[in-house]
């Protein structure tokens, strides 16, 4: 638990429920862990980027910037948000499927942003926008993620140029006056450490083809445990393994390459929780099969954390307080949306199969906490569904102060992009 019951109640009193709470101290601890690469490679040879798609809130971007991290962005709008948080564009790498419009791309490049070409057509677009020194994302055939939906390498992935296209990448780049200075590869989120290590070796095998490359960006996807049968990736072990192969490459080639990584989940997942409230507890008994069905209905669900219904992700749930003498029970826990898939308790990687959560018997008004929701929850929230609106966010500072960093979305904000227009029926019904 990253916050005491007293703090959780204070957040609920401050902004209501549902609400996100982020613990600054925990986030800083996880940044320190990721800097194992810096301690192994040396500060001058390593860059830690934050994959801002994991959570793009301005206060959190500012925290990572103040901690000295650079940014991995996945859309032109993310570049805009990073700059809005006073992050220098020279610290931003843009890796996306579809590049921004040429005028916008040219403006970003002129002011120092680093463009990453993930498709052959990107090379022409970047050159037309005035790009010179570029990154290229290459799919070297290795893919590994916590689920098929989070695997971003291998034959089944659309991300990055395929490794057999390297000769064409080089030919086009030279013809366009582009200099490839960084190689990038990202194999997936929640990846297997052994596959990640193998991909590092494959990247170095191909580095000889790019004489101007000075940096290898090894991507992100470092596993952060959210469940008792999951294992957090050992960053120091990965760093030491990478260092050995980088040193061997230097001895063979004479090139001393820099290294970058761009974690998102690893840096912020553990540092966030979602605070909700129990509204109903229902019990049903199936006499034909002798099975009890308990359902706990809360005000947190898919509109605050879509990972559960998208991936079959598992997040621990606890009531506050955890133990007040009430009997234990097994219950399905669901959200408030008018959607059967809005469940908080599902089987591993299978959102279509529910599981029961063991907890003390909930009662109306209890606070409930969903853990490890710092990453890919707020940023992926389909809050327009059922017109629920956005949940607010609070930051717990190391000195114990609670700071509201986003307000609850209003009804007016739900419709602010809509045009008042009343179509005339075309059929007489």
Regions found by a protein language model. Give the residues of each.
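Structured core elements
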Residues: 70, 93, 116, 135-137, ...
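Acidic/histidine-enriched ion/cofactor-binding microenvironments in catalytic or ligand-binding pockets
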Residues: 129, 205, 211-213, 237-240, ...
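Short acidic, glycine/serine/threonine-rich loops at helix termini
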Residues: 61, 84, 104-107, 126-130, ...
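Active-site beta-loop-alpha junctions enriched in small/polar residues
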Residues: 25-26, 51-57, 76-77, 97-99, ...
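Active-site loop/helix belt of alpha/beta enzymes
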Residues: 140-286, 386-388
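Charged (often Lys/Glu-rich) extended helix/loop segments that serve as interaction or gating elements
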Residues: 32, 254-429
